[in-house]
């Protein structure tokens, strides 16, 4: 479910040494399954453990996860990285905003998952987003762009060299390509 690297475990162990005995950590998601999902880590003293919590034991500590957050923390990783600028704790939870779908789920659900978990986080850095409108019978994903992507002069590159390439790589037997449904109108909202 959650991976905590050795460096992160060592960091948490130092912090926990200054807390009351048997205090562990809690990993959680606020607003799970929504575009506003946020992940966090907090101290979890013994009296804060709930009956429906899942305990994940690591070498140097335990992490508690509530049952609502658990499916959204699938494949999450906590690391403690050090570079020239200093050190920081990182928490990557690719499924926090959308629950991971099964490999045998319908194609439309699997494509939607990739768009929400991998593509939209990249587009968000430019204030953009993409939505899956439908998948045609002949295997084309029909997409609609919004935000900073609408009217952006780089949309063809994003569509063909970015999104289409990624989706065809992931679904080679099921998709033939992607098409843009958006009526692009350049404005102040456009990224380029």
Swiss-Prot record:
<dbReference type="GO" id="GO:0016226">
    <property type="term" value="P:iron-sulfur cluster assembly"/>
</dbReference>
<dbReference type="Pfam" id="PF01521">
    <property type="entry name" value="Fe-S_biosyn"/>
</dbReference>
<dbReference type="GO" id="GO:0005506">
    <property type="term" value="F:iron ion binding"/>
</dbReference>
<dbReference type="InterPro" id="IPR034904">
    <property type="entry name" value="FSCA_dom_sf"/>
</dbReference>
<comment type="function">
    <text>Involved in iron-sulfur cluster biogenesis. Binds a 4Fe-4S cluster, can transfer this cluster to apoproteins, and thereby intervenes in the maturation of Fe/S proteins. Could also act as a scaffold/chaperone for damaged Fe/S proteins.</text>
</comment>
<dbReference type="InterPro" id="IPR017726">
    <property type="entry name" value="Fe/S_biogenesis_protein_NfuA"/>
</dbReference>
<comment type="similarity">
    <text>Belongs to the NfuA family.</text>
</comment>
<dbReference type="InterPro" id="IPR001075">
    <property type="entry name" value="NIF_FeS_clus_asmbl_NifU_C"/>
</dbReference>
<feature type="binding site">
    <location>
        <position position="149"/>
    </location>
    <ligand>
        <name>[4Fe-4S] cluster</name>
    </ligand>
</feature>
<dbReference type="GO" id="GO:0051539">
    <property type="term" value="F:4 iron, 4 sulfur cluster binding"/>
</dbReference>
<feature type="binding site">
    <location>
        <position position="152"/>
    </location>
    <ligand>
        <name>[4Fe-4S] cluster</name>
    </ligand>
</feature>
<dbReference type="InterPro" id="IPR000361">
    <property type="entry name" value="FeS_biogenesis"/>
</dbReference>
<keyword id="KW-0479">Metal-binding</keyword>
<dbReference type="GO" id="GO:0051604">
    <property type="term" value="P:protein maturation"/>
</dbReference>
<comment type="subunit">
    <text>Homodimer.</text>
</comment>
<keyword id="KW-0411">Iron-sulfur</keyword>
<dbReference type="InterPro" id="IPR035903">
    <property type="entry name" value="HesB-like_dom_sf"/>
</dbReference>
<protein>
    <recommendedName>
        <fullName>Fe/S biogenesis protein NfuA</fullName>
    </recommendedName>
</protein>
<dbReference type="Pfam" id="PF01106">
    <property type="entry name" value="NifU"/>
</dbReference>
<keyword id="KW-0004">4Fe-4S</keyword>
<keyword id="KW-0408">Iron</keyword>
